[in-house]
């Protein structure tokens, strides 16, 4: 066990430790144990099938090509940079995110955090370092204990449920001040650096921006923030949901990813020339996103619900056009100075696994840079007036991803195989559900 972790446990009087890893869906899985036992561990173990568990808790019937037939153990190694308190726990509790390896020391190819590490190593080999800043949208809703009923906005301090369409309203955020006070305190206790909090367009829909920085650290923060928001909401008898489209008549929720690249030696942006103009690498990064994001859609929109958000009638992208300060485009270049020139990927849903989404977005840009791709001309009008070019269902997106050789090469064939097996299994389970729409319109009409 690294000495930094032992010291943290001692200094904070920790009695219990949550050893966690993010699975394919971004769910925290792992083990909880006494701090004394955790400090003695020299390689905790879990079955490798943990990465093949679906969001419903099931497993694919055929896992050939994704894992060993014996379902061997994998070894967990604690990352000392990730040790934090669990501020909502009743007892002094710590949480530590782990990386996953096989017994021979080889990294587990289907582990999402390891996939992001692999992409960052490709950048580092060329003297580059990505800088990212995720924005996460989410809804607050009343507790929903019967999934057959639609979700409802919660009642705030005024005693009224919010009707919606309160973009940037301070008063609408103030309705839930006690919840956000807890959320901010929880985040501060975990070194989750929230830059801003705003009210979005939907009823009780919020957005937080994380302060830009190292891609792996920001993925950790986004992963932990989702858990934190849910815990804070539960304290106030609400749910915080990161579903991409929780309400039929409200906007969906996204995870916008701002990304740039700096030179590891000079720390200057490779997206800008010395005279401040956009560089060739900047345009190639955009071109890589344009070419490969449609192939990677299943990684950014990972659930059947994700595709309800992708609509020209909602405030969400429907294609991979790019533009300067254009929020209708899938790829937006915000107004900035040369040092902070960046690209905002607006395609990923809030339901995406942060490690996978950030790894994917950076991988697509990387491919454009190393292949010297050229982007289309920037769009000046509304991208919603142009054709929808993104996959329209999880089934279509998964098939497209499975056939993408460039993405398998950069993200790892083992990961793509495991991920598509999981998504195919989830889609098959979804097809077994008969919806209320089918009963309403088909029961007596066909």
Language model region names:
Residues 23, 101-107, 172, 212-218, ...:
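A generic structural motif
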């Amino acid at each position: 066990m690294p000495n930094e972790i032992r010291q943290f446990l001692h200094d904070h009087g920790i009695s219990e430790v949550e050893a966690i890893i993010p699975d394919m869906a971004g769910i925290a899985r792992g083990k909880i144990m006494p701090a004394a036992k955790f400090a003695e561990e020299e390689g905790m173990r879990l079955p490798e099938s943990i990465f093949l568990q679906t969001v419903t808790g099931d497993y694919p019937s055929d896992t050939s090509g994704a894992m060993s037939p014996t379902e061997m153990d994998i070894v967990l190694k604690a990352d000392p940079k990730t040790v934090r308190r669990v501020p909502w726990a009743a007892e002094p509790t710590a949480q530590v995110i782990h990386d996953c390896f096989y017994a021979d020391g080889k990294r587990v190819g289907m582990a999402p955090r390891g996939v992001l590490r692999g992409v960052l190593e490709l950048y580092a080999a060329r003297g580059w370092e990505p800088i990212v800043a995720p924005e996460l949208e989410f809804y607050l809703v009343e507790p929903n204990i019967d999934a057959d009923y639609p979700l409802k906005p919660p009642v705030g301090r005024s005693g009224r449920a919010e009707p919606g369409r309160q973009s940037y309203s301070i008063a609408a955020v103030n309705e839930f001040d006690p919840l956000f006070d807890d959320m901010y305190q929880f985040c501060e206790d975990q070194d989750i650096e929230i830059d801003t909090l705003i009210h979005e367009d939907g009823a009780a829909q919020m957005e937080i921006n994380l302060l830009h920085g190292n891609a792996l650290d920001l993925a950790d923060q986004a992963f932990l923030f989702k858990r934190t928001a849910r815990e804070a909401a539960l304290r106030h008898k609400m749910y915080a949901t990161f579903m991409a489209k929780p309400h039929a008549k409200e906007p969906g929720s996204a995870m916008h990813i701002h990304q740039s690249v700096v030179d590891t030696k000079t720390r200057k942006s490779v997206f800008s020339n010395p005279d401040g103009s956009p560089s060739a690498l900047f345009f190639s990064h955009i071109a890589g996103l344009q070419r490969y994001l449609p192939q990677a859609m299943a990684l950014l929109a990972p659930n059947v619900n994700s595709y309800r958000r992708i609509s020209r009638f909602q405030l969400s992208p429907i294609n991979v056009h790019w533009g300067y300060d254009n929020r209708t485009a899938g790829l937006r270049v915000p107004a900035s100075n040369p040092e902070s020139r960046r690209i905002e990927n607006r395609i990923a849903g809030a339901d995406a696994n942060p490690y996978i989404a950030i790894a994917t977005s950076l991988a697509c840009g990387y491919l454009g840079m190393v292949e010297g791709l050229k982007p289309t001309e920037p769009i000046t009008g509304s991208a919603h007036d142009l054709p929808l070019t993104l996959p329209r269902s999880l089934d279509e997106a998964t098939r497209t991803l499975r056939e993408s050789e460039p993405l398998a090469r950069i993200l790892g064939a083992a990961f793509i195989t495991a991920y598509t097996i999981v998504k195919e299994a989830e889609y098959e389970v979804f097809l077994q559900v008969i919806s209320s729409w089918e009963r309403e319109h088909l029961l007596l009409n066909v």
